[in-house]
């Protein structure tokens, strides 16, 4: 009933869902008044609520560079209105056209796949609140719930990750419980991924193989994609998975340990000689919320869509206790009057008593844990790299 600028206008908070929902309501009522649609076909669970409505609106969307700010940003939201005996609930929408450098063409399916995935229950994996997360996303092209929906201008959006498939009930993941040699074909052909559990039930690491074929052909690289998950129902429900830079609850563990937007080609294992993920590697086997997972993955190899790797018995490495603390390139853990130190670089570390007496002085080697026995329980000072921190046994 109105022009695009009416439905695309923003409210006081910068959101256009209120007016866009009005558009969807008007469309739904026009369809109902036509008398040509049997709404029971769209109520799969027979609860008298239409399961969802999807609208592709004419013209372009606000999500593309240089778009008119009065166009509608594609989104999923809620709109309740009665249509005879039925009610509406969730809806999603996206644009007809794709705009790039002053040209326009029919939009690809990428944005549709992203918004439809919201309807299915998946959250965004980019930070939805920039003020609290900044550039907290590590996914970009790796997930359709981030920038991956725009691969090949939206005509070849990236396929779903292991967590996305697992969350939707489309595949199971196999928990690794014992050391051995493992083979992992590409997720798109074998529908399999491995899970490394932690002592925290809802925190774990996922291993999945990606090759540059099919829906994955426009990814930056191929190999073993390793991600960490720290599931929290409330955070998922509120669509705030990666809004906290210090608690990224679903993140890529990048093989090159570089999380900038322009180094995605180095995210998958193996890369540039890095073929392992342990508590002492760089990057470390630690989730985005700081949960250590002491299941060493080594000898990662990738060839022709298949990854092989070794799971090493954790008793073959020094076990880092769950109270892991990481500080400026050094990690330490204290238990049973012992402290274990591990550094990313060769550095000298000195432990002092509170009276200034030297308890131990050692030179740490990268990747080699050092265990020190403390004389008694109490407070100590740890000095390294011209830093002094207090530790409590």
Regions found by a protein language model. Name each.
Residues 1-138, 142, 146-154, 159-172, ...:
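Active-site-proximal segment of zinc-dependent metalloprotease catalytic domains
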Residues 321-393:
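C-terminal outer-membrane/trafficking sorting elements
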Residues 51-53, 108-109, 143, 203-205, ...:
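Residue-level detector of short, conserved catalytic/binding motifs and their immediate flanks
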Residues 21, 65-102, 168-318:
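Non-catalytic C-terminal accessory/binding modules of secreted extracellular proteins
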